[in-house]
């Protein structure tokens, strides 16, 4: 399985092409639209999300509600493009029109300046448009297809926010996977403690009035993955490494942890390692899950626990100082439309990116020309692991 995305933030549309999806997977536009709508939701989103109503168009690879095994083409129309026809025109236009919405005051924390240097851009909008988080629309669309595969194999997942702009969410003890999932899904903030909703919303409103932004830490949990996915035989086959790369590729993500993560640096080995158990009904298991479901780059059969830290959004309505790329004089950074926080949306993106990596690993590990073939191979492997 592989995919490409294309499109600019204010261009006509966004596109993804996915190759390697088994034939026979039940797939409807509504499956993808559901995830796209989740990405657009959440408290703290800005005006762009009130303009766009993301709906996918499937133009290849699916017939009569089933995948055919051919490449799948997904497209999402940018409604806002109608206001940017001159700025984002494909053909050549008058010089005066080229200066319209030109970006020459790069924003600290964005790809504007370095992208302009690398690709020799006189207008930094050429970097801004593609590096925008709008691109993640299509990664969510791809992830929605991946989640359909995982669901057919009995794999489920959730995400929730652990830290919201410096406010630590108190996680009620002994919540089951399903309870965590339901609480996060029914929260505008993707948190599992409803008692903290108003406190955080008030804080977001305050940050917005200040023209500032906040980040935080997101946790994704995956249930139902059997032991043995990934490999220790080469560095690039380790599944946790693949997940780390994928999570860090999401806009504004600056760190990844598995299990208790960086807290391991403060603990002894006897406190961190997950003791092994065995029962006739369950087979091998672990007493704890400090390592987040990974050992030696492979899944252990425990829930996968992946955490990602998102920096505050770099576009500030009270802009930081920058430099004019023409005169090299100090100047306030360009202001583009932005949100005080996008943590709930980032959680949806992270969840779908993780789903894509896991689906790809499964498709590369098991016979998967068709879904029935994949389901049989996966079921047989689960049975083997249980009796080992």
Curated annotation (Swiss-Prot):
Q: Which residues bind NADP(+)?
A: 39, 45
Known EC number(s)?
Answer: 4.2.3.5
Which molecular-function annotations from GO does this UniProt entry contain? chorismate synthase activity; FMN binding
SUPFAM superfamilies from the UniProt entry: Chorismate synthase, AroC
Where would you find the membrane-spanning parts of this chain?
A: none
The coenzyme or cofactor needed here is: FMNH2
Q: What class of enzyme is it?
A: lyase
Q: How is the cofactor bound?
A: Reduced FMN (FMNH(2)).
Presence of the UniProt keyword DNA damage in the record: no
Part of which pathway? Metabolic intermediate biosynthesis; chorismate biosynthesis; chorismate from D-erythrose 4-phosphate and phosphoenolpyruvate: step 7/7
Residues binding FMN are 130-132, 251-252, 296, 311-315, 337
Per the record, its GO cellular-component terms are: cytosol
Alphabetical keyword list:
Amino-acid biosynthesis, Aromatic amino acid biosynthesis, FAD, Flavoprotein, FMN, Lyase, NADP
- Give the reactions, separated by semicolons, that this protein catalyses: 5-O-(1-carboxyvinyl)-3-phosphoshikimate = chorismate + phosphate
Q: List the disulfide bonds.
A: none
Q: What does this protein do?
A: This reaction introduces a second double bond into the aromatic ring system.
Q: Per its UniProt record, what NCBIfam families does this chain match?
A: aroC, PRK05382.1
Give the protein family.
Answer: Belongs to the chorismate synthase family.
- Describe its partners and assembly state: Homotetramer.
Name by which UniProt lists this protein: Chorismate synthase
Q: Which organism is it from?
A: Streptococcus pyogenes serotype M4 (strain MGAS10750)
Q: What is the lineage of its organism?
A: Bacteria, Bacillati, Bacillota, Bacilli, Lactobacillales
């Amino acid at each position: 399985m592989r995919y490409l995305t294309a499109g600019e933030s204010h261009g006509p549309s966004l596109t993804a092409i996915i190759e390697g999806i088994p034939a026979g997977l039940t797939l409807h536009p509504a499956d993808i639209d559901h995830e796209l709508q989740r990405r657009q939701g959440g408290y703290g989103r800005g005006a762009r999300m009130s303009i766009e109503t993301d709906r996918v168009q499937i133009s290849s690879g699916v017939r009569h509600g089933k995948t055919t095994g051919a490449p799948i083409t997904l497209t999402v129309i940018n409604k806002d493009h109608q206001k940017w026809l001159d700025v984002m025109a494909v053909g050549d236009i008058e010089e005066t029109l080229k200066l319209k919405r030109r970006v020459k005051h790069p924003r600290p924390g964005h790809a504007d300046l370095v992208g302009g240097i690398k690709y020799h851009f006189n207008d930094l909008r050429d970097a801004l448009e593609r590096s925008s988080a709008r691109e993640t629309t299509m990664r969510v669309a791809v992830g929605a297809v991946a989640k359909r595969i995982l669901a057919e194999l009995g794999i489920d997942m959730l995400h929730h926010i652990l830290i919201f702009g410096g406010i630590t969410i108190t996680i009620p003890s002994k919540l089951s996977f399903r309870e965590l999932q339901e609480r996060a899904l029914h929260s505008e903030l993707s948190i599992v403690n409803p008692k903290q909703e108003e406190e955080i919303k008030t804080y977001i409103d305050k940050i917005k009035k200040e023209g500032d932004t906040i980040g935080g830490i997101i946790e994704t949990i995956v249930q139902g993955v059997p032991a043995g996915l990934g490999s220790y035989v080469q560095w690039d086959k380790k599944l946790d490494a693949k997940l780390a790369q994928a999570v860090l590729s999401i806009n504004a993500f600056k760190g990844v942890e598995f299990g208790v993560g960086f807290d391991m640096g403060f603990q002894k080995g006897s406190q961190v390692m997950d003791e092994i158990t065995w029962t006739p009904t369950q087979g091998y298991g672990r007493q704890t899950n400090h390592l987040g479901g990974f050992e030696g780059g492979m899944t252990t059969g425990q829930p996968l626990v992946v955490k990602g830290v998102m920096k505050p959004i770099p576009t500030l309505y009270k802009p930081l100082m920058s430099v004019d790329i023409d005169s090299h004089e100090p100047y306030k950074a360009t202001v583009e439309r932005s949100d005080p926080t996008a943590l709930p949306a980032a959680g949806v993106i992270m969840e779908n990116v993780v789903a894509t990596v896991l689906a790809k690993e499964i498709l590369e590990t098991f016979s998967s020309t068709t879904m029935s073939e994949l389901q049989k191979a996966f079921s047989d492997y689960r049975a083997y692991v249980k009796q080992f």
